[in-house]
Amino acid sequence: MKDISFSVVIPAYNASESIITTLDCLNEQSYKNFDVIIVDDKSADAQKLAEVVSSERYSGLKINLVLSETKLNGAGARNRGIDLATGDYVCFLDADDEWHKDKLQQNLSLIERLEGQGDRRFIIYSQVNIIQDGSFLKVMPLKPVGEHESIAEYLFGCYGFIQTSTIVLKREDAAEIRFDERYIRHQDYDLCIRADKLGFKFVMIAQPLANYHMVTRFGSQHKGESVKYSLFWLDAMKPHLTRRDVYTYKAYKLPLRYKMDGKSLQASLSFARYFFLTNKDNRNDFLKRLMNKLRTRLTGK
């Protein structure tokens, strides 16, 4: 089998400081056949980013830095990276996340196995360590997508999660699917849902191969996480969603947006209306987690 190459696509926005640990993790990768495409999204610190990228510290990396003169947002920046990719496979990595040193090696091993058994259209993802405000929170997803479960149900429910910095797919497949540049939020949901509809197989590596950093000190508006945006996105996605997919979003995701907007009553009503219309696995997982929380509060353990 040929020596498979990867293109790592990194969208960057005011990321000249956070990208240092991101590039450090690429320096440490055990598998070396990859190039890096950084697309800066018209940042105020673009020149500082250029200085970081061109420093001796990263002289061993093959980096193509693109300084966009127009605002692209995350979807557009990733699409620009896809267009410039030359590797056999495209990997996405956010400019404030990190990979485990064997991330590419483990993906390579899985790719060789999948290709060896005749699989042609697949998307690889892995578990991630979720770091909230600098502290470890949890590992997600809890399990891979179910055999009879849509990717939308999986992503919208309680146990599923496909973080962008773990996604790996063939370059030609990335070029076919692309990110929808209308969306400032949920671009990763959209890409995965449309890939599912096209018949792509989703394969999870049951090991956290990335650190995903969440910051909660900002309000919900700062990344388009408002109820208004969520309803716009859900309506735009309806051609790709089943009725139960929509119910699952309104039971588990939309209540979180209501809470972030300070609308606790609407959150409770949305959950109550749609919870029993979601699949059994999501209902059982939610109830199990609820019981665990109650037990912890009662026992202090």
UniProtKB/Swiss-Prot annotation:
Keyword Cell inner membrane: no
Pathway connected to this protein: Glycan metabolism; exopolysaccharide biosynthesis
Keyword vocabulary terms for this entry: Exopolysaccharide synthesis, Glycosyltransferase, Transferase, Virulence
InterPro entries given in the database record: Glyco_trans_2-like (IPR001173), Glycosyltransf_2 (IPR050834), Nucleotide-diphossugar_trans (IPR029044)
Signal peptide residue numbers: none
One MF term in the entry's GO annotations: glycosyltransferase activity
Enzyme Commission designation: 2.4.-.-
UniProt xrefs under Gene3D superfamilies: Spore Coat Polysaccharide Biosynthesis Protein SpsA, Chain A
CDD domains, sorted: Glyco_tranf_GTA_type (cd00761)
Keyword field contains Lyase: no
Root EC class: transferase
One Gene Ontology term from the biological process aspect of the record: polysaccharide biosynthetic process
Record-stated family: Belongs to the glycosyltransferase 2 family.
PANTHER family listed in its UniProt record: GLYCOSYLTRANSFERASE, GLYCOSYLTRANSFERASE 2-LIKE DOMAIN-CONTAINING PROTEIN
Function statement: Involved in the biosynthesis of amylovoran, which functions as a virulence factor. May function as a glycosyl transferase which transfers galactose from UDP-galactose to a lipid-linked amylovoran-subunit precursor.
Protein name per Swiss-Prot or TrEMBL: Amylovoran biosynthesis glycosyltransferase AmsB
Lineage: Bacteria, Pseudomonadati, Pseudomonadota, Gammaproteobacteria, Enterobacterales
Gene name of the encoded protein: amsB
